[in-house]
Amino acid sequence: MSGPNNIFDLGKMAMSAQMVRMNTLASNIANAGSVASSPEEAYRAMRPVFETEYFGHIGDLGTLATSRAVDVVQLDREPESKFLPDHPLADADGFVYASTVNVEEEMVEMLEASREYQNTLEAVSTMRTLMSRTVAMGK
């Protein structure tokens, strides 16, 4: 992939990465209360995997870096078994298996992703304002 052409491209890439993160978290929260008839079928929380991309020579003044989502993986957590013999999804022993989503953890992650998105948006907006003022000075 070619590097960003300007600060707006860099902001777009960073905001896109945070959107992947927020969409994954939203999916986790939506499936938090789900149950299944076996541990294999139970919903497992997911997390995006990010990769840092550098544009220019690392260590040089003016080197740009951003991150991008390269994959979404399931967390390695075992679903909790609950004894609910009257539940329609209960197995032969009367157990259902709950999703591995921790709603509090997901909400903290969502808040962090939202703030990172907002910070990037503010940086891009500030850069746009500075560019506009610079152009206005030349008139």
Question: Where would I find each of the regions flagged by the language model?
Answer:
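Amphipathic alpha-helical polymerization modules
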Residues: 1-139
